[in-house]
Amino acid sequence: MDAYHELAYSYDRLTNDVDYEATVSFYEQIMEREGVRPRTAVDLACGTGSVALILARKGIRVTGVDLSEEMLTMACQKAESLAYPPQFVCQPLQRLKLPRGVDLAVCALDSMDYILDPNDCREAIVRVYKSLNPGGIFIFDVNTPEKLRSMDGQVFLDEDDDVFCVWRGEFDEETNICSYGMDLFQREGQVWHRSFEEHQEYAYSRDQLTDYLCDAGFTHIKVYGDRRFGPPMPGEQRIYFSARKGIVK
């Protein structure tokens, strides 16, 4: 079954420990350093819209883009109470096309790693560049190859009321892809329903992504550790990138 099909309906409960506010706060710190004050933004691979909603509540006009219709359904439901909710669009990132330019593009929670073909990743970054206004900024994070390799052979459990998930990691050195076989159990009344999804992430290196950003035309490329300023440390599990489009002087 496709990734984020059945999982979409339990995703927020299984990830209730994710601090989206802290992630957006780090974006804001980066933008403050770069002198960017966005009025418009796109949240790439937005999932159930948690980051998009935080940005929208700050008065930013937001578009959320994701490949999963089920995740976008949940995002729309969460946005119903907002006076100016994000607009949500179902698109693959390598075919990203927005009706107008934006000042900020973000891609949270290692979602870029889900692009399994490096050529598609390169094209996605080009599309992001074209979607940004001059002086705009692109901020995203990825899992490091070290982290994805460490997942090989590991078994993980996540649970909340009425939902239970067990997943197993397997890293393939030939393809550079980490696969997660995920068994999901969701309860409806007295009945438990089981489904299976496979999630995969490509282990992009820091140099590889830096090259893609440069080739797309980005400048002022910076790489940070996990929600902290300063270069990534040895063994870092997540790193952040920020890059600018043609700063207007």
Regions found by a protein language model. Give the residues of each.
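A short His-aromatic
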Residues: 113-115
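A short acidic, Gly/Pro-enriched loop at the edge of an enzyme's catalytic core
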Residues: 97-104
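C-terminal lobe and adjacent flexible extensions of AdoMet/dcAdoMet transferase-like proteins
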Residues: 202, 206-249
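Residues lining the SAM
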Residues: 108-110
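Conserved class I S-adenosyl-L-methionine
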Residues: 1-37
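Class I SAM-dependent methyltransferase SAM/SAH-binding core
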Residues: 42, 49-95
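SAM-dependent methyltransferase
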Residues: 139-210
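A short glycine-rich, Lys/Arg-flanked "PGG" loop and its adjoining helix->strand segment in the class I
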Residues: 122-134
